[in-house]
Regions:
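Secreted/periplasmic carbohydrate-active enzymes, especially glycoside hydrolases
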Residues: 1-244, 257-299
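Active-site clefts of carbohydrate-active enzymes
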Residues: 249-254
């Protein structure tokens, strides 16, 4: 249900029945709401977030109870919330607190038709020193192309592929899949599955974007800023091209630090999508270009 406060804010309310078990951790995930929101569980404020377009997670393990739980999301407008989910994970799990991303960073490097390098890094914390992370790279039909296990203390894996199939828009929207497993005492306790694509991006002096050396017509480039990550999933599979306009993120930020945080969240949450060809900043925020290059060096 939705109620309205005297100062014009909207309160989205829900009763969440739960069979709480002590061996699990519980996170609330919100795909997006108004420019700012506050989250209450059983009338206790547990977090707040600025940014309509970025996913937000908060640990609610200590606040929820066995039985009915009251969830209130207070927004500064009546814009409907996108999906809210309760994520249940074991005590040992990939990070759900790393800027709202998947807990896994996939950065293609040195891409050509003959070879490709992909830097893959999982994010985890509070794990035993002997914990391991296993990485497996597959085709979408399940053929294994590479695999390796690394210690959690050195989680980066540089994967090399020969003769890769490039993601080439609607001509060939070829995707790969990386599966990361968290291994503790010989058992896989958590797993992440993330699709990704391989393509070369560059930009000409006139502003035209090239994908694998071919110019993308302006009419084929969708200018967007999405809250729901499933939109980009569909574009990856369909072979559509997106130019992500970041102006609205900059406009809703309270200050420079808030703007940096919003941009970091959005880029890290969506950088693995091959359909996103470029990030576009407004001219009055061009000083954040260095931040975008630091977060994502693969796009022009």
């Amino acid at each position: 249900s939705t109620e309205k406060t005297p100062d014009g804010k909207a309160v989205h309310k829900r009763i969440l029945p739960l069979n709480k078990e002590d061996e699990y951790c519980y996170y609330l995930e919100l795909l997006g709401a108004a420019p700012s929101m506050e989250v209450f569980v059983n009338q206790e404020k547990i977090g707040d977030h600025t940014g309509s377009y970025t996913l937000y997670r908060v640990d609610v393990t200590d606040q929820i109870v066995n039985g009915d739980n009251e969830l209130d999301i207070v927004c500064d407008s009546e814009v409907p919330c996108l999906d809210a989910s309760l994520i249940v994970v074991g005590k040992h799990h990939f990070s759900l607190d790393h800027f709202g991303d998947a807990g896994l960073t996939v950065i293609p490097q040195e891409i050509s038709t003959s070879s490709a390098s992909i830097r893959i890094t999982a994010h985890a914390k509070n794990l035993p020193e002997d914990a391991m992370i296993s990485y497996t790279v597959l085709t979408t039909t399940g053929t294994m192309l590479a695999n390796k296990s690394v210690p959690v203390s050195a989680p980066e894996y540089i994967c090399h592929l020969t003769n890769p199939c490039l993601w080439n828009g609607k001509t060939s929207p070829k995707l790969y899949v990386v599966v990361a497993g968290l291994i503790v005492n010989g058992a896989t306790e958590d797993q992440i599955v993330l699709p990704f694509g391989l393509r070369n991006l560059s930009m000409e002096s006139n502003g035209s974007v090239l994908v694998n050396g071919l110019c993308v017509p302006e009419k084929d480039l969708i200018r967007t800023l999405e809250s729901d990550p499933f939109v980009y999933d569909d574009m990856d599979e369909d072979g559509s091209f997106a130019c992500v306009e970041l102006k609205e993120l900059c406009d809703i930020a309270a200050d420079e630090e808030d703007c940096r945080n919003l941009l970091t969240e959005y880029v890290l949450q969506n950088a693995y999508h091959p359909s996103i060809l470029c990030w576009k900043l407004p001219e009055d925020h061009a000083d954040f270009a260095a931040l975008l290059r630091e977060l994502d060096s693969t796009r022009p």
